[in-house]
């Protein structure tokens, strides 16, 4: 991208951006929640739309001069509704966390009981963690995975729901590698007359392309981020049934946010448009293929995959048998140019700052053009680095850099 002005006005900051650019260019990015946006997304975010205040919603603003940003937001909403066959869409949430907060506030009262997935079993901070607003403002109880299969125990979920009769059941996850049965969860919600909310932040791209069953027909509310598998700007969005539209919109503004970020909403419109194209479906299909191959190769090297494998874009790996913690593995792999994140595993025995596992995903490397052969090489690099962690790994680092050079991030930037 062109940084001519920044070069003249703030070379100190530009130097930091350039260092991060180099890190992204020459590292294999395996953090499951990260991706690389298109140049079109970045251009939209860097546009003069950032100058415009637009409190309210299209055609009902609290400021003048909003006729063109109204068009932008309308475009984003219509594309998002089309992408997921939804009745109503709100594209103003600044993040997935704020999207979740708005849904809770739209129909619940402080202190109401909500059933959500345990964070250490693959849930998310905003699904009831005691250190998060969700756990502080609401009475969250949790469900998790079966100890043997390491997949969601729907019977136990139902039992907990019947015993506690929560006002809402939240599903969706940040570290769960299997298909989620939204129909089953809907049936449980109906049995206890509870709202159903799905946080599909991680799997939105899979849902959009039919590679994971859609929660939209079943859920009252669906939240997502726009920067993971959707490959857009950092931000959030909410889909809901038409009957909840006013309550959701009111919860976002004036409930928890003021002015929307119109430059980000423009970038969301771009990414929704990209996700409606056929080449995006091919991309997501390759993500799933890559993840399966990477998982099988790692299993061949003796890594234990939580639940035995994957149905989506990510893998959760128990490193106990490799005699290394998630924290140490993250640091080690980072030193050779592979970026992962430490992650708790179900029935974790270590601190969340240490962890027994790591979480990896293929959306970012697939965006670069990596395919099955590269997945085999990544598995080799990971295994070799961990098995030979006391040795000099400069050769591995160099090989990783060479692969990255073959698949440059932005060829025409």
Swiss-Prot record:
Positions with a binding annotation for (6S)-5,6,7,8-tetrahydrofolate: 119, 123-125, 351-353
Chief place of localization: cytoplasm
Subcellular compartments: Cytoplasm
Molecular-function GO term, any one: pyridoxal phosphate binding
Species annotation: Clostridium botulinum (strain Hall / ATCC 3502 / NCTC 13319 / Type A)
Residues carrying the site annotation Plays an important role in substrate specificity: 227
UniProt subunit comment: Homodimer.
Stated family: Belongs to the SHMT family.
Entry protein name: Serine hydroxymethyltransferase
Top EC class of this enzyme: transferase
Presence of the UniProt keyword Nucleus in the record: no
UniProt-listed Enzyme Commission number(s): 2.1.2.1
GO cellular component: cytoplasm; cytosol
Function: Catalyzes the reversible interconversion of serine and glycine with tetrahydrofolate (THF) serving as the one-carbon carrier. This reaction serves as the major source of one-carbon groups required for the biosynthesis of purines, thymidylate, methionine, and other important biomolecules. Also exhibits THF-independent aldolase activity toward beta-hydroxyamino acids, producing glycine and aldehydes, via a retro-aldol mechanism.
InterPro entries in the cross-refs: PyrdxlP-dep_Trfase, PyrdxlP-dep_Trfase_major, PyrdxlP-dep_Trfase_small, Ser_HO-MeTrfase, Ser_HO-MeTrfase-like, Ser_HO-MeTrfase_PLP_BS, SHMT-like_dom
Taxonomy of the source species: Bacteria, Bacillati, Bacillota, Clostridia, Eubacteriales
PROSITE patterns (alphabetical): SHMT
Biological pathway: One-carbon metabolism; tetrahydrofolate interconversion; Amino-acid biosynthesis; glycine biosynthesis; glycine from L-serine: step 1/1
